[in-house]
Regions:
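A structural preference for short, pocket-lining loop segments at secondary-structure junctions
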Residues: 85-118
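Conserved catalytic cores of soluble enzyme domains
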Residues: 122-239
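N-terminal short beta-loop-beta anion/metal-coordinating cradle
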Residues: 39-57
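Well-ordered, non-membrane alpha-helical segments in soluble/globular domains
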Residues: 80-94, 125-135, 240-247
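STAS-typified acidic loop motif
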Residues: 54-84
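Structural beta-sheet core signal
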Residues: 60-62, 109, 150
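Short acidic, glycine/proline-rich loop/turn micro-motifs
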Residues: 70-74, 118-123
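Amphipathic alpha-helical segments at domain termini/boundaries
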Residues: 2-5, 12-40, 190, 194-284
Length: 284
């Protein structure tokens, strides 16, 4: 009851609109897709826009903070119930619309997601199904021939990243300390491994899959490219040119090759994975 009253009050607050959460995801979405407002019918935490990249049709998708999100645990850009199902619907819509089209539009996930939404309501209403719905839609689109590109501009954490971005044929990350990829946030990981955050960081320096920084992640071979930028919070003109060029190259690269995720097994830290796969093939 108290929350609905607060919500009503919030909408009357003249400052609430002028002070949104600072969101890299929204800044890059606006710069690349040229649009700002949510589409009618989409949750305010979801941004979807159709545009072009080098003359090829592209649907841009981003999950952004919404301080008025009806689910309090999804107010800071987390992927929750509305966001998971919203992404699934937006991807499915493109899949259906392009079913007969010779050129399937590219899906470009702009990734800045701190985590999935953790809460009792989320658990009760099936957050795992909402996230799985998004993963499934992206995977089906990729297999149907839609080029998928993930652009990491901020955090790419846990189930949120799996639901939005991870299914991409090509992952591109901005080279910046604020761009972090991990299975879970540092504080949670420290709790679960019974270490302090400092101990965890020391350990991560020796074990690349445990690290958070983008260079360690790049060594695992999942990133197609990392890009330096001048002003990561609000992209400069030079940043935009560089990122657009790279996205165009990624698109051309996808359109010219197979649509599976085999490209990830080329990197140094993935040699063991590639060797295991080869040995398995030889033995079977």
């Amino acid at each position: 009851m108290g929350s609905s009253h607060h919500h009503h009050h919030h909408s009357q607050d003249p400052n609430s609109m002028s002070q949104p959460f600072a969101s890299r995801g929204l800044a890059w979405f606006q710069a690349l897709a040229g649009s700002l407002a949510p589409r009618p019918g989409d949750p305010a935490s979801l941004r979807v826009a159709d545009a072009e990249l080098d003359g090829y049709p592209v649907r841009f998708l981003a999950v952004v903070p919404d301080p008025d999100n009806p689910f309090p645990r999804a107010r800071q850009g987390e992927v929750g119930l509305l966001e998971g199902w919203g992404l699934a619907a937006a991807v499915d819509e493109a899949l259906e619309a392009d079913r007969e089209a010779p050129r399937k539009r590219a899906l470009l996930a702009i990734v800045d997601v701190p985590s999935q939404a953790y809460g009792r309501r989320e658990e009760a209403l099936g957050i795992h199904q909402a996230l799985a719905g998004a993963v499934d839609a992206y995977a089906r689109a990729r297999l149907a021939g839609h080029p998928l590109i993930g652009l990491l501009v901020g955090k790419a954490m846990s189930g949120a990243f799996l639901a939005h971005g991870y299914q991409a044929n090509r992952l591109i990350a901005l080279h910046d300390p604020g761009v972090m990829v991990h299975a879970m946030g540092k504080a949670a990981a420290a709790r679960i491994t019974l270490r302090s955050v400092e101990e965890l960081e020391a350990l991560a320096a020796k074990v690349p899959p445990m690290a958070y920084d983008i260079d360690s992640y790049a060594s695992l071979g999942l990133l197609w490219r990392t890009l330096p930028v001048e002003t990561v919070e609000v992209p400069s003109t030079a940043d935009l040119v560089r990122v657009r060029t790279c996205l165009g190259e990624a698109l051309a690269d996808i359109l010219g090759g197979p649509r599976d995720l085999g490209g990830r097994l080329g990197a140094a830290n993935r040699e063991a994975s590639a060797r295991v796969r080869r040995l398995l093939r030889e033995q079977w």
